[in-house]
Structure formats: C-alpha cells, structure tokens
C-alpha cells in the first residue's frame, strides 16, 4: 500500500476585475469576480516542493487583468474562453483550465429620462455566473461552458399549494391550498454549443425562469422547478441541461388570532433557518455527457 | 463613590415582518426588518431582577406583527410612528420608544409587458431606512423621524479628480485628474415635519442624491457629499439635516505597462480593504436640535 | 428528443439543534447545524405535483430535533448515521439519505481553575464537519462517512519559501526564501470503517494537520498540504482519503523603505482578495471508491 | 436661512496590519484591523473641493503600517495613542483624531506539549477592541481611551429565570424558572487613567465578565449585565464606565411532546432572528464625562 496524490488543482480565486470602455463619451462598464484554476501533472510540487511546472497564482492574477484589456470584456463567456484556452494552449504543463466568473450588473443613472454617460448604480439583483472548462490541445481540445445566476429572490403571494404529502410519526405540518412561495434561486445551465449570443441567451433564460415561476400554479416547489427547467430547454435548443437549487424561504403565517385579529394570508414571519432546499436537474434525454462542466473550483457554479 | 446604572434600553431586534395586501387580485407587498427599543426607568430589573415594569421582548415581537395588520404597513414611517406611540402611550413604564426599520423593495414581475398580480423579484438595490423616536406623553410628547438608505452602490468612471492635497513624510499618493469614484452610500435625513408624503419624499431624496453624484464634477468625495446633502435640503423644506457616510470603494488602476499594454483608465482592481471613509452632516443653520433622532439602537440608522 | 428529470434531492437545511445533557449537576452541551437530504424516485412531485411520496422537509426538521433526544447527540457521526439509516430504512420511497453536520465547539468556563458546571464560551476556532450517506436497505445497504473541519486559520511567520516557479510574459512575482504562510484550512477525510472512536479520531486528525503545518519546512503550500494528508493517512489506518482546500491568505510585505524604515519580514498587509487557492486529494492507492461520500448537498463538506 | 456643513470626519478604515517580532527564534505576532479618522476644519474640501488641508487617506494607510514598525505594536492601546497623537501633534490642520482597533488573537501551536516558535492558530473567540480619541495640542490636549471586546458567545444551560414581567394584550410569553441564557457579548469600557497595564487589564476585565455571567443566578439578562459591569468597576479603579450590549440569543425548547418524547430542557432550537437586545451602561457616580470616548467612526466600538 502506498499513499499517493489524487486529483488536484490550483489557481487564483476572486480577482475583482472592473473594465470600462471609454472610446466615446458614453462609457461602458463590466464588473466581475473571476477565478482561474489549472489542472495537470503538478505532482513534483506536491511531492518534492519543485515549482518548475507551476505558473504562480500571482501570474494568473496578472493575466486576468491583462486579458480584460487584450481580449476585452464584452461577455463573460468569451472572456472566460479566452483565458481558459490561453492556459491550456500557451502554458506547457497545463492540461486543463477552469475559469469561474461572477458578474455584478450596473444600471445607468437616468436624469430627467436621459441616461448618464458615465454614472451607474449597482443593480443589486441577481449575480450572473459563467464557468468555462477547457481540456486538451489542438484537435483533442474539448470545451464546456455553463451559464447561470444566483441570489435571484422571487416570491409569489398566492398560487401555491402544498398537500397530499407522505406522513410519518414525526409529521405535524398542516396541508395548505394557499401559501407564500419564495426562493433565492440558483440556476446553472450547460450550453451544448459555443456559437451562442451569450448576452441574449442570458437575458432570455432569466426571463423564462422568472416568467415560469409566476405563471405555473404550484403544487410543490419541485413541480415549479421542473417547469422552469423544461421551458428553458424548450426555448433554447443550444442548452442541454439546467440545474436548479432552490431554498424554500419560509414565510410563516403569524398567529394573530391570539390577539383577536384575523390573518388571511396577510402577515408573515420571514424565517432564516432552517429552510427547505430542493435541487434538481432537467435535461434532454439525448444531452451530451456533462463531463467536467459542473466540477466546481470555488463553489461559484 | 457608588456604582450606578447609566442609560439603558431594551427591545426586540430584527423582526422580519412581511405584509401582503390581497383585497383585490392585484396583491401588494411590504417586506421589513423592524426593531423596537423601550426606554424608561427599568432600574428594578437591572438592580434587583424585578421584571414588573418590563414588557417582554417577546411581546414586542407579537406587537410588531399585530400592528402590520391592525395599523397596516403602507409606509414604514407611519407604521413606526404607530408602534412608537403605542409603547409610550399605552405601556405605563415606557417613557421613550425607538423604532428602527429596514425595508427591502420588490419589483413586480412583468410578462410581455404586463405586470403580474402576485409575483415579485427582490429589487436588491439599496435598503430603505426609517427611525422613529417618541418621548413623553400628551402635550409633552415629542417625536423625531429620520429617513434614509444604505447599500446604494454608485460609481462614475470619469468626472472625478483628486490633487492638491496636504503631504507629509508618509505621503506617496500620486495626484490624479481622472479617476473612478465609487461608494456604497449610507444617507439618513431628519424630517422637521410629520406632515410628509413619506413615499414621495423617499423617492425624491434618492433621486436627488443619485443625480447629484452624477452631475457634480468632483474634486473630492467630500465636495460631492456636501453637494448631495445641500441639494436635498434645497429641494425639501421639511428636511432639516442630512447625514452621509461614504466609503471610498477604491478602484485601483492595474499596472499593465509591465506587459506592454496601455491602461488608459480601462482596467481596475476593485479592492476590499482598507477603504477611505468620509462622513459629513449638512444642515440648515436654523435646524431644530436633532435630539435623540440619531441615537441608534441596532446600528441600522 | 424528450425533456426529462435528472438527479434530484430535497431536504431541510441548517437545523440549529442544541442538545444539553443534565443528568448530573455537571451539564454537557453539543451545538450543531444539521441538514438532511433525501434521494429516491420523486418524479411524481416534479412532473405532476403529486406529493404522495414526499416526506415534508418540515418532518425532517422535527426528526432532527427528536433524534437529538431519542438517539442522543454524543458524536455527530453516530447521530448522522442514525438519521440517515432512519430515512432509508423507515420511509419507503427513500432510497438514499445524506446528512451533513457542522459542529460548533464550546469550552467550559473556568473560575479560579475550577471548571463551571453549566457555563461555556463558544470556542470559536474551527468548525467540525461530518457527512453521512446511506444508500439501499438490508444486505444491499452501503454507508459512507466523512469527517472534516473548516475555518481553521493557521499561520507560520517563517519556514516557508517560494521560488523556482514557471514564468511566462505575465509573471512579475519575486521569488522568496522567507515568507509568511497562512491559510484558512478546509479538510475532509473519508473513513473506510464505521468502527471508529469518532471523538478521538477527530482530535487526532486535527492534531496531525496542525502539527504537520508547523513542522514541515515549506517550499510550496502544495508540498505542505500533501504532507498533512500523508501523515493523517499514516497515523489512521481507518482513513482512506484526505481532501484539502487551502486558500493562500496572502500577507504582503509592506514597503516601508519609502519612509526610511527597514522591514525585515515584520510588517505585513493581510489582503482579502484575490487569494491563491490550492486543492488536493491524498489517498491510499488501494482506497475503496469514494462513491457518493463527497456528493455535497449544502456545500458543507 | 443657509445650508451649512455640520460635524464631519474622514480617514482610512480597516487597515489589516499584521506585525511580527523576530529578534529571537521565538517569534511574536499581533494581528489588527485599524481605522483612523481625522477631525478639524476641513470645510474648504467640502465647500470648494480644496484639498490643501486634507492629508490623504492613503497617507493614513501608510502611517498605520509605518507606525507598527516605528512605534511597535505591543499593545493596541499604546499603538493607538501613538497614532492619534501623531495626527494631532504633527499634522497642522488636524484638531482631533480617532483611532479604532480590532485585534484578532492567535494561540501558539503546541507539539507534544512544547510551544512552537513561529506557528499559530487563530484563537477565533472574542475580538478585542480599543478606541483612542485625542483632541487639542500641548497643555490643552485631552485623551480618551476605551477598551472592549465583541463576539464573545457565552451560554449557561441553567441558572436563569424569567417571570413576573409586565403583561399587556399582546403578551403570550410563558414565565419560566429554568431556561438557557446565551448572548454574543459586546462590552466596552472607559479608562479614566492612561497609566494602565493594558494587557493585564484586558485579560482581567474579560475574566470578570465571564466569571460573573457564570456565577450570577439570573432573574433577567438585565440583572446579569449590571452585575458584570459592577464587578468590573469594583475590580479596576481605573475604569470609569462599562457599556454592555447583549443580544439574547434565544434557545427555544423544541416541542417533542408531539412525538411522545419528554424534553426536560435538553433539546433546543437556536434561533437567528428576531432576538432580544439589552443595552446598559454601568458607571461610577463620580465618573468623568465620557466626552467623545464613544463617538464611533466605523461602528467598531
């Protein structure tokens, strides 16, 4: 029996790159948190402390900022592809690279209906996600791209039921035909093509997710999530799979009867913990294997 | 020499009250985090453990939820006034009450341009604040109301200079005539009247703050903040004082010259810590004394 | 082509269970955050909103608290095993269960060298982790247990070098033979046996990890991590694999030469982001397959 | 009526200074988060954007690191005093300076009972606090120093009652003669002398606070807090006032009777929000005026 090195990766996490474009008086801005991880044979570093195959994480930091200039930053998927391919193609010991990106959206300030050229307010709503994985070189090169979002907090004040569930001796929940349903959605999706208008795809997927949450009369959060994933796949042929993780942000009806007050689903306590947590994948039955598409580095995607 | 009890207060912090209105198919929602603190002679509780003058914090929790039904929750200032007056007027040992509220805004989901009746997405931008303090009863009763906001992240990519500053042997900063200026603004303001349309006032003040940040060509964050406060006071005669606390969220130009790349204010590192922190009050020279308007309980306001 | 439901699980996350033992005047306390996830054929809930196979997450909450009484809570691994087996053995539709636990340690208050019977201070150092996965019933039942820790912040002020690394056009890092090395360690390990003294094993593994970090003269964080994992495996035959995730918490030497001051590795800026992030597995070459041991539900392990 | 500038201050917040001493093989380490604020007539900066009186916050950052070398960092109070006096004495426009410090404690790693020379684990328990305010120069100079701690989580599993409280129509709380009492203590104290052994004083005050929490049979958190403050004042003649802020971290008895289980104060749900929050000052009746001792800049103290 011997003790051996197993799977490993290393990189620079959470580079906070802000990129403006100022070729004209009307500036543009992109604001991201990017992490890069390199995979390959780094056993000498682990076993002997020999760094000769190790490109420093400091270099990866420099590269993240330099590529925001050299390659531009007009969509996080393209930027991530450029970075991942660079490491695999240009740095000899690197056999695979994983780039994970969070993007924070800004909205242009409007003054009397006119958009300001160079001032923005952070939108603050959901965080956009992307992850790019590239493995191998030349003809053997394979690429996986996922998009996503997190922290999209969405709520409906009716149109949600929960009853008919399995019971056991520990079950005390009262069935309901009308409840508040709310979640802080995490959704990621695997693109089966690289020939995608990333900006339009992101906006479109978000729109389908939100719209479906609103439109589906819900018998369970599970049912709503499946419909959300299904409708994304129906709308976008270049998406192979959608993964959803949805905490059930409980809104408990507050017992006001003790004070002689009726509470017809009007006053709730929004509780923190514990919370229900539903996770599901929705995919095409002919979807290509996900491979390392969802093998996370920092937990972003 | 004796050891004595000094100023004290107690209450229930961070009640997460969500209130819907569902009288018609088009529902409404308000989502708040409310804290109540009571002030008065509670020395028996401290000195002898005698609770006979102490209304439990659990009761304050119940009251926060009950008042969302009884009094409604159509503006946080009115709701806060109702709660504060209740404690001072109805609970004998209470001589003063402080209500602090954070409000989280939701925006209605739109489907094909039509607003949905009962589904919303958390806006996620700034958090609205209010604090109400009531002291004394009947003719001796005094009331202070402050409004505010926090977490409003705003940035301009040009139109900001910083030079001509004082130097000493520890000064290494390079003057600049063009930099990114960004902050996560906290602003609070003291209403000198209670006869205010709170919703309109909040929207208006936020608009003035954002607009002024955009419009003022900045020679220093201090200068921008003073103008922001000044224009709020000019626009709203019923506001006596504005207090601003603004972290300078540094965006450092990344040195790309090392890689043969020009960086003409295009690529920045958004740093976390440390950060400059500027705080200032702007007020009318005939402003009434602020009294306990800003004597915080939970640090919300 | 059809759209189908892929892998899914659901449960109640972050139940904050505190269990005291008070059979004698000297009380004991265990303080945990426990999440349970159920796996099985829940397609009816997703596809049709039919809950008849779904044990509510509310029931899982009740069960977490009830089992702290019924089964006791003397080690998180045994408690997790009892919960996981209960779901798989007693709830018919459940084919697999995953229990993830964080434990917060308390230390007894000492007064004049005498330990107090019923007062503790939260230790506050690392958080202990465990995850139990059970699949199948009767003879086909399989069980995986991992232990772990997170948030163990450890630093050495010398005995760490970093040089001889690969360079490319983006490399600007200066090699060093003496630097501060610090991390906030996450380590998890897979037990190949269930016949383990869990409390002793945890204390022992933590001790080996800390001791090895101190004793190894480091040429790279990678090398230190491999040694940490290797020595755990050498010391504990019932551990098959160790996984380590270590952010390099950078301590940058502050340039005091600008002020005529020498800085011989004495004054550092502890930076927040970005950070190097090294991840590695160390295992026996005859280790059993990890199976779902590390298939996380909440990201705890 | 004119609009004028009110009270203002500015500085550099949250400088993360780490200072090692390595004169001998046995190193020492101090790890702090320090903020400095300057007060004076900075109206030209606010009103006209004229920075000629403004020492940049970047300079304050440099100074914080430089002083960790020049003045050393053997106690945060002495380091804070040196910084504050420097700004007031050496920088002409500065009339007052406020230095706020958080300190994170490290404990030396022990290997087989022998302390390691240069490896530590972050203790992780409470955060130590200090704030220094200096106003005026030469004979007119006044100085205030407060010490403190935060995040000290302490719990007793019995020895706490709560009954006999005031009731009103919203009161539903059940009185109890035996409950868990827990808090995450914030305590700050005002030193009436500068001739203090700061390290011994801090350790002593913490010890009195913890011991008193344990020893007092509690009829209310208020009563416990008053005793904690009183005993600190009795023990340390050079402390004039103690301020305590204590969230009541509720541990709710879980209703296990529904499952046929007895719960004799053994199984609790540790709730997050809302929480009771008790704040009180305990002082000598001849205490000097606190002046600006507690006028916070960053909310640290």
What label would you give each PLM region?
Chain A
Residues 1-301:
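N-terminal intrinsically disordered, cationic/polar leader segments
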